[in-house]
Amino acid sequence: MGQKINPTGLRVGIIKDWESKWYAGKDYADLLHEDIKIREYLENRLSTAAVSSIEIERAANRVNITIHTGKPGMVIGKGGSEVEALRKSLNNLTGKRVHINIVEIKKVDLDATLVADSIARQLENRISFRRAQKQAIQRAMRGGAKGIKTQVSGRLGGADIARAEHYSEGTVPLHTLRADIDYGTAEADTTYGKLGVKVWIYRGEVLPTKTDK
C-alpha cells in the first residue's frame, strides 16, 4: 500500500495538512474549478520562481493564497510590484478579493518538488540522468535528510525502449504514517519525448503532540 500510493495523500489528516482549506455546499464544483484555475495560473506565471506548493483558504468573498517558494524575491518583485500585479490578475480571474502570503523555503534541497524540478531542468539541458540524480541525493543528505529516493522514467539517453531507473540513499519508510516524507514530481521535455521525475525525501519522524483535555 505505502509503496504505491501518493505519500502525501496517505498522510493527509495525520501529519500532513490539506492544500485547499474551505467548505462549500452546492457551489463546491465551481470553487474546485476556481482552485484549479488559480493553481495553473500561478504555476505558469511563476514557473522560474521555484514554487513548491500553493495553499488556498476561503472566507466569505475573500481568497487567501499562500505561496511556498525557494525564491521569494522573484515572486515579490522590486518594492512588491510583482506580487501586487499578481494580486490584481487573480482579482480579475476570480472576481473576489485576493490576499497573497509569501513563505520562503529555507532548505530547498529538502523539498521534494523543488528537487524533482531541478533534476527535470538538468535533463532538459542534456545532463546525464545518473549524474543529475546522484548530485541531488548528495545535496539532500548533506542538507540533513534521513533518506531520499529518486526515479527517472522514459526514453533515458534516447533509448528506443522506455525504462525507469532509480537511486536511493538512507531510509525511506513509506509504510510508517508518522514518517515525514515529502513527495514531488516533475516532467522534462527532451528531444526524445517526456521524462518523468519522482522524488521521495524522508525528513524524520513527526511525533503527535499531546492536547490538553
Swiss-Prot record:
This is Small ribosomal subunit protein uS3. The keyword Acetylation does not apply. Keywords: Ribonucleoprotein, Ribosomal protein, RNA-binding, rRNA-binding. PROSITE patterns: KH_TYPE_2, RIBOSOMAL_S3. Binds the lower part of the 30S subunit head. Binds mRNA in the 70S ribosome, positioning it for translation. One of its GO terms (cellular component) is cytosolic small ribosomal subunit. Residues 38-106 form the KH type-2 domain. Part of the 30S ribosomal subunit. Forms a tight complex with proteins S10 and S14. GO terms for molecular function: mRNA binding; rRNA binding; structural constituent of ribosome. NCBIfam families: rpsC_bact (TIGR01009). Belongs to the universal ribosomal protein uS3 family. One of its GO terms (biological process) is translation. HAMAP family: Ribosomal_uS3_B.
